[in-house]
Every structure is written in C-alpha cells, then in structure tokens.
Amino acid sequence: CEINAWSGPFIMAAANTRVVRRTEALLGLRQESYGSNFTYQEHAFHQSWFSAFKSLIITGISVLVLMSPLKRAVKPFLPKPGEGPSKAVQENGWFDCKYIAETEDGEKSVFHMHGKGDPGYKVTSKLVSECALCLIEDAESLPGGFEYGGILTSAAGLGNPLIERLSKVGVNFEGPI
C-alpha cells in the first residue's frame, strides 16, 4: 500500500490541496466529514532521486523567475493565449494519480484515477463539460439535493453522479471512493 518512488513538488498541489480542504469543510457542514484529523498532501512521484531533484530545481527556478522582474524578460518565450499543445500531444497524453488514505488506526487503502489525454487540455475540458452536464441532467440526484448551492467544489456539489459520468468518458476510477 506504499508508493515506492521519490517525491517532488507537483505544480497543481497549491490549488488542489485547497480544493480538497474546502470539500472537507463543505462535507462537514452536512455531517459527512472525512474526520477531525483529516490532512491532505500532494506530490509528484519520480523513479529516481535524480529525477525528483531535477524537478525540484526546475520548479524552484520557474517560480523564482515568474515572481521576479525577470518575468518580463522570459514572457516573450512563453506560450501566448490560444497557443497550446498540438492535437497529437493532446491525444497521446495521459495522467495517473494514486491516493493513499490512512485511517486513524493505521489502516490504508489505495484509490487510483487515470486516463488518456493531456491532463491540462483534453482531460480538463472533459471535466468541465461533464460538471456542466451533471448540473443540468442529474440535478435531482446530486448530493445535498436540487436546492443545495453556494460556492461548492465538484466533489461536494456533484459527488457520485459526476464520478459515474467521468467513468463513461475515459476518466477511470479504481478502489474505494
């Protein structure tokens, strides 16, 4: 139940961790909390220490450059709005996420989410589209009911109906949900 790899920073962790924590808070309001000791961390995994170290250095340099006056110097070399990966890159990309949940008594289980397609473009568009369709077509079966609303996360507001939709479009889920 362990992941035998080196860990390094993951570019989306800053946003994702906040979404997960907001979901936990929203579920707590419905008495469906993950538990009072819930924590969440996110990392990228690498096959070797060198790959993890290289990722750390590249991420660190990128953050420093983009948050300094050097940003103006590198901006002309960055992708412009509307530019992105080719259709072939979008089609041939993939993502593979493993989550390990550990209970207070030390019991662990693994949840796996994976799929084909560039996660930043193709998969994200699937996620957004299926969220919208879920709101329109599955409103009666959403967690909290039809009238539950506010500034929700996809997990708190759409729940299992969204998971079922995503499974039909190539976003695969394995393990306990």
Predicted regions and their residues:
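C-terminal catalytic/substrate-binding lobe primarily of soluble NAD(P)-dependent oxidoreductases
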Residues: 1-177
